[in-house]
């Protein structure tokens, strides 16, 4: 985790593809003294842009709850908001940022292009739709949501569109989500700009070690969605919740932390960016309290050992436009 020097750097102009940003300082709006002094470590992407080590996700957050949840997250100290076109709440994310009192320059916005909008021209227009709903001219990180392996020519064309948006300064970084090594090898061979991130399912019950190594060896930052294993609660009846796992619970007790905080810390110490989600203010604050303790090597290894190899989300190979091709509304 990169924490930078004392203090924090002033963000570069939003249209720059480079960044001298070291720190995302919380604003003073509605903070306790403890939170107002917190500064978020950042991780360097392969193009020099920095991303906060922890983000706030809004997957499956209903639009009517999104504004309050995102405002709460920003007032807690989060400075990265992760949304997606298919979530149906980009507009509410933008509204929350405007209501929060936090400057746009201090918020790292990430969104995802859905498979219905793959292809070169469609992906260019998808940016316009997302930017319009978010109410911004520039998106910090734009990624392809799925590999769509059965029509990978459309995936490559969509990524070419992201490269164009990046070259034009409309996005500060580009990447992918749910790509496996075979998908990444082909993408790297057929495009010019390596993805800055690969947002994937990673949690103690599903670590994806081979993919983590592949991404790291190619300078691709791993972002963990479902970082505390929430996706497993309804997919795998053979295991108890990660929040109830005795190994994790014992480690949490040793540090005076919660199981969720221990799992997030496990990701951070292994170099992954994490995107927890919640609509509950207490949980939002709990998930942010992960920068004041450190797990031992033995504790990290013990959590690694919980891997079941069982995926909670859909298999990337099974994602097709026939099954998942919902239309994305205009801005």
Q: Where in this protein do the model-derived segments appear?
A:
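N-terminal binding-site loop/beta-alpha segment at the start of enzyme catalytic domains
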Residues: 19-107, 157, 161, 228-231, ...
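CE4/NodB-like, metal-dependent polysaccharide N-deacetylase domain
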Residues: 123-144, 164-168, 190
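Short, acidic/polar
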Residues: 62-73, 119-133, 184
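Beta/alpha (TIM)-barrel catalytic core signal, keyed to glycine-rich beta->alpha loops juxtaposed to Asp/Glu
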Residues: 147-331
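Acidic (Asp/Glu)-rich catalytic clusters
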Residues: 46, 94-104, 128-135, 188-191, ...
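Compositionally biased, low-complexity flexible segments
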Residues: 5-6, 10-17
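Active-site mouth loops of central-metabolism enzymes
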Residues: 53-64, 113-120, 151
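A short, structured active-site edge motif that brings together acidic residues
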Residues: 104-118, 140-147, 202
């Amino acid at each position: 985790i990169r924490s930078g020097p004392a203090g924090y750097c002033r963000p570069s102009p939003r249209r720059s593809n480079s960044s001298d940003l070291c720190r995302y300082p919380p604003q003073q709006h509605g903070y306790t003294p403890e939170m107002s002094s917190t500064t978020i470590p950042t991780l360097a992407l392969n193009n020099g842009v920095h991303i906060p080590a922890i983000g706030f996700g809004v997957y499956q957050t209903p639009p009517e709850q999104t504004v309050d949840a995102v405002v709460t997250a920003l007032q807690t100290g989060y400075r990265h908001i992760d949304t997606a076109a298919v979530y149906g709440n980009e507009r509410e994310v933008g509204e929350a940022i405007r209501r929060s009192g936090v400057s746009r320059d201090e918020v790292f916005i990430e969104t995802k292009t859905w498979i219905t909008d793959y292809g070169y021209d469609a992906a260019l227009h998808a940016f316009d739709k997302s930017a319009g709903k978010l109410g911004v001219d520039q998106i910090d990180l734009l990624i392809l949501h799925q590999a769509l392996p059965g029509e990978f020519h459309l995936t490559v064309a969509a990524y070419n569109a992201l490269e164009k948006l990046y070259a034009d300064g409309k996005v500060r970084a580009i990447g992918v989500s749910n790509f496996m090594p075979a998908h990444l090898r082909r993408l790297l061979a057929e495009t010019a700009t390596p993805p800055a991130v690969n947002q994937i399912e990673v949690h103690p019950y599903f670590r994806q070690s081979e993919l983590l190594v592949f991404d790291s060896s190619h300078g691709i930052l791993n972002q963990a969605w479902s970082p505390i294993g929430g996706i497993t609660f309804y997919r795998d009846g053979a295991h108890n919740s990660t929040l109830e796992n005795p190994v994790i619970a014992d480690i949490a007790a040793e540090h005076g932390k919660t199981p969720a905080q221990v799992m997030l810390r496990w990701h951070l110490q292994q170099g992954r960016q994490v995107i927890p989600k919640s609509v509950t203010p207490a949980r939002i604050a709990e998930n942010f309290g992960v920068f004041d303790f450190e797990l031992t090597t033995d504790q990290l290894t013990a959590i690694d050992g919980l891997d079941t190899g069982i995926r909670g989300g859909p298999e990337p190979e099974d994602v097709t436009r026939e099954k998942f091709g919902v239309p994305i509304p205009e801005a």
